[in-house]
């Protein structure tokens, strides 16, 4: 069965990084990397090259951890900063609150503490209302 385009290529969507295709050069690089076999789980030549590039730009101690999309990056970032019972204080309109589909709580096990605001910005007073029980994993 021939492959056909099933969508209107003139339509643009900016609600998510998952809406658009990749640049043709990226797709060509993926196709080239797809030829043949490589060891898996980060032991391949492409991951080694990625680490070299990151070390060059960000210093010898920098390491890259590739993830599938923005949600994966956000969950990984939060997971790296918080204990499993940790929490993030976020405005009710924050991206992490409304657009991640519960992934931080489901995957990372952290809690998103939803703070209603008039302008989408947290103030010290709003944070203080939620920031009680530090050091208590049962909070």
Language model segments and positions:
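N-terminal amphipathic/basic leader segments beginning at the initiator methionine
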Residues: 1-29
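Conserved PLP-anchoring active-site segment centered on the Schiff-base-forming lysine
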Residues: 80-98
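PLP-dependent aminotransferase-class I/II
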Residues: 108-139
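Solvent-exposed alpha-helices and their adjacent loops that cap or buttress functional pockets
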Residues: 5-8, 55-59, 80-81, 105-107, ...
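Conserved core of the PLP fold type I
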Residues: 62-82, 113-120
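Short, conserved acidic/polar surface loops in the N-terminal third of protein domains
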Residues: 76-79, 99-103, 107, 123-126
């Amino acid at each position: 069965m021939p492959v056909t385009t099933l969508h209107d290529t003139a339509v643009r969507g900016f609600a998510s990084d998952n809406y658009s295709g990749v640049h043709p050069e990226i797709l060509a690089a993926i196709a080239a990397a797809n030829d043949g076999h490589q060891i898996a789980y980060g032991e391949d030549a492409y991951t080694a090259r990625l680490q070299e590039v990151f070390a060059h730009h960000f210093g010898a101690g920098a390491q890259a951890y590739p993830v599938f999309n923005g949600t994966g990056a956000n969950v990984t970032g939060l997971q790296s900063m918080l204990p499993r019972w940790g929490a993030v204080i976020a405005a009710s309109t924050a991206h992490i609150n409304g657009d991640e589909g519960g992934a931080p709580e489901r995957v990372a096990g952290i809690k998103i503490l939803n703070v209603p605001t008039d302008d989408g910005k947290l103030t010290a007073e709003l944070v203080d209302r939620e920031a009680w029980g530090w050091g208590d994993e049962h909070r």
